[in-house]
Amino acid sequence: MQKMSSIPNVIFILCDIANNIELLNSTFDKKKFDVVLSDMAPKACGNKQVDHANIINLCEMSLEIAVKFIKPNGIFITKILQGEYEKEFYQSVKYHFNSVKYFKPKASRKDSSEMYLVSLGFKENLEYI
């Protein structure tokens, strides 16, 4: 995990998200946010399929958090790698948001499968799938 410099009006929690859902629940109890942004990435092992599966797992956790804590019409942005489970995850995000688009930053290498999903218009009152 990498530390991050503080940013005004941004709450930053450095933790293992897989083991600290309760920390998030207690910290943000009943609070809702305009944006949930996930730049999480697992440590790469070099096997593209394993690396892809690991980042999709993090994406699913970040989506679950977004669905719980985001305001109606809110924004969810998450880092993703192209691969076998990408379309299924895209459909899960599309279920919860009105618009979902891929974005590849100019700083990203052209041969990299790293992208971001930018999701706008959170649909409130849908159960997490």
Swiss-Prot record:
Its main location: cytoplasm. It is found in: Cytoplasm. It catalyses: uridine(2552) in 23S rRNA + S-adenosyl-L-methionine = 2'-O-methyluridine(2552) in 23S rRNA + S-adenosyl-L-homocysteine + H(+). Its EC number is 2.1.1.166. Keywords: Cytoplasm, Methyltransferase, rRNA processing, S-adenosyl-L-methionine, Transferase. Pfam families: FtsJ. InterPro entries: RNA_methyltr_RlmE, RNA_MeTrfase_FtsJ_dom, SAM-dependent_MTases_sf. Specifically methylates the uridine in position 2552 of 23S rRNA at the 2'-O position of the ribose in the fully assembled 50S ribosomal subunit. This is Ribosomal RNA large subunit methyltransferase E. It comes from Ehrlichia ruminantium (strain Gardel). The lineage of its organism: Bacteria, Pseudomonadati, Pseudomonadota, Alphaproteobacteria, Rickettsiales.
